[in-house]
UniProtKB/Swiss-Prot annotation:
Gene3D superfamilies: Dihydrodipicolinate Reductase, domain 2 (3.30.360.10), NAD(P)-binding Rossmann-like Domain (3.40.50.720). PANTHER family: GLYCERALDEHYDE 3-PHOSPHATE DEHYDROGENASE, GLYCERALDEHYDE-3-PHOSPHATE DEHYDROGENASE-RELATED. Pathway: Carbohydrate degradation; glycolysis; pyruvate from D-glyceraldehyde 3-phosphate: step 1/5. GO terms for biological process: glucose metabolic process; glycolytic process. This is Glyceraldehyde-3-phosphate dehydrogenase 3.
Length: 341
């Protein structure tokens, strides 16, 4: 089958890393990018140099209004560049972009993302949680995608992509009565470098490099949308910490069936080596956050950091590159839904 043709709206952290993931995986063909705030020569620079993930190990240039991205042994991507503020005006159809990654963080509802369909896109994948679009987590519920009816979908959040595979394995094997999640989360672009105003959430406006900032997250509750049996059983919060990338989930849960920590490790390792390979990983190494920069997995279970109080009450720890792991799942989701076309 021919590779799915992809457009990217918004060339920020996720937009650029989705393109990197697309080049690495060589499973989709990126044919168009839209960003009203970035000129084409600036796109070349931003794509080539990355403070977190390093310099792009390939070539990137521009010719007219096309980006040319290539890597040895991989397909070249010739990418039409648009600079439209209104998503309805982007000529996705003219570029042949059937699948659009909506990564501006602005058009996250069905109504708003629907504008891409007017420009000729066939499907829209929102790279953020959505209030009303169906959410899919690759490895957990992606097979529930309905090609006939699901035209605008969400890839959920990076944290939900970390938590859901872990929660699925634990719930399938031992049953989760209830659980609380904490994510210790790297800074993101929405935070302030120094103290500043921040709408209703005053703490969010404090300096990102100076503080551990308690914050809300819908990631745990969203697992209930992805795994209906867990609906109403999980909630959580976040601590934003002064690191540039890589976050870690702490899931504290009560189990229906008694299980030793070794029992839990065995089933997670079996899933990581089997049906969830490439999504859920397992480590017994003495790792820290920087060890997972540019890791392509959604969730890396840390066997050494996880603890048990008794056979019914456990704290499970799982790492994730909140930028790159997530961006790889966006590409995987597109690859999957394209097989249903």
């Amino acid at each position: 089958m021919t590779k799915p043709s992809v457009g990217i709206n918004g060339f920020g952290r996720i937009g650029r890393l989705v393109l990197r993931a697309a080049v690495e995986k060589d499973s989709v063909n990126v044919v168009a990018v839209n960003d009203p705030f970035i000129s084409i020569d600036y796109m070349v620079y931003l794509f080539q140099y990355d403070s977190t993930h390093g310099r792009f190990k390939g070539t990137v240039a521009h010719e007219g209004d096309y980006l040319l991205v290539a890597k040895e042994g991989k397909s070249q991507h010739k990418i039409k560049v648009y600079n439209s503020r209104d998503p309805a005006e982007i000529q996705w159809g003219a570029s042949g972009a059937d699948y659009v990654v909506e990564s501006t963080g602005v058009f996250t509802t069905i109504e708003k993302a629907n504008a891409h369909l007017k420009g000729g896109a066939k499907k829209v994948i929102i790279s953020a949680p959505s209030a009303d679009a169906p959410m899919f987590v690759v490895g957990v519920n992606h097979e529930k995608y309905d090609h006939a009816n699901d035209h605008i979908i969400s890839n959920a959040s990076c944290t939900t992509n970390c938590l859901a595979p872990l929660a699925k394995v634990i719930n399938d094997n031992f049953g989760i009565i209830e659980g609380l999640m904490t994510t210790v989360h790297a800074v993101t672009a929405t935070q302030k470098t120094v103290d500043g105003p921040s709408g209703k959430l005053w703490r969010d406006g404090r300096g990102a490099g100076q503080n551990i900032i308690p914050a809300s997250t819908g990631a745990a509750k969203a697992v209930g949308k992805v795994i209906p049996e867990l609906n109403g059983k999980l909630t959580g919060m976040a601590f934003r910490v002064p690191t540039p990338d890589v976050s870690v989930v702490d899931l504290t849960a009560r189990l229906e069936k008694p299980a030793s920590l070794d029992d839990i490790k065995k089933v997670i390792k079996a899933a990581a080596d089997g049906p969830m390979k490439g999504i859920l990983a397992y480590t017994e190494d003495q790792v820290v956050s920087t060890d997972f920069v540019s890791d392509t997995n959604s969730s890396i279970f840390d066997a050494g950091a996880s603890i048990s109080l008794n056979p019914h009450f456990v704290k499970l720890v799982s790492w994730y590159d909140n930028e790159f792991g997530y961006s790889n799942r966006v590409v995987d989701l597109i690859s999957y839904i394209a097989t249903k076309a």
